[in-house]
């Protein structure tokens, strides 16, 4: 699939089949994201790959609009130290979209669950604290989104 087709056919997948995603496929998605552009070429993002069912179940409880994470075969949390770059949110969004398009090109489905809410700082803090606890991410590190990855349900 070429990039234009991936852009046109990309959809949010919130129903996943039980077919597992290989570790190599997940690593490829993260590797592609590492090549994403970032402000001042800071590349401050980091990626946490989640494959444990219990962790995915707990992540799905971060807020009501991400319950579908419990059906994903894997998750990729984008994390960043906000002190490293003032463009941390934009940079993470670009990297997340790179993951998304690469996943579509590999026949995988993806959706992202927003953990950062610019208009509601308290809700943003609550969601991110939940994810940090589940994934043992230190305080002060932002988690703008968690992406669910898997093969779409037919």
Which stretches of residues belong to each language-model region?
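Acidic, surface-exposed loops and disordered segments
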Residues: 1-154
């Amino acid at each position: 699939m070429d990039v234009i087709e991936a852009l046109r056919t990309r959809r949010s997948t919130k129903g996943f089949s039980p077919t597992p995603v290989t570790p190599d496929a997940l690593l490829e998605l993260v590797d592609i994201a590492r090549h994403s552009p970032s402000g001042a070429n800071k590349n401050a993002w980091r990626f946490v790959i989640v494959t444990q069912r219990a962790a995915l179940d707990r992540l799905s409880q971060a807020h009501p609009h991400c319950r579908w994470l419990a059906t994903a075969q894997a998750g990729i949390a984008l994390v960043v130290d906000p002190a490293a770059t003032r463009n941390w949110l934009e940079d993470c969004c670009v990297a997340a979209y790179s993951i998304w398009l690469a996943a579509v090109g590999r026949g995988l489905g993806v959706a992202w669950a927003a953990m950062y809410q610019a208009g509601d700082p308290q809700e943003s803090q609550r969601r991110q604290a939940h994810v940090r606890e589940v994934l043992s991410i230190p305080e002060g590190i932002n988690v703008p989104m968690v992406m669910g990855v898997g093969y779409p349900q037919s």
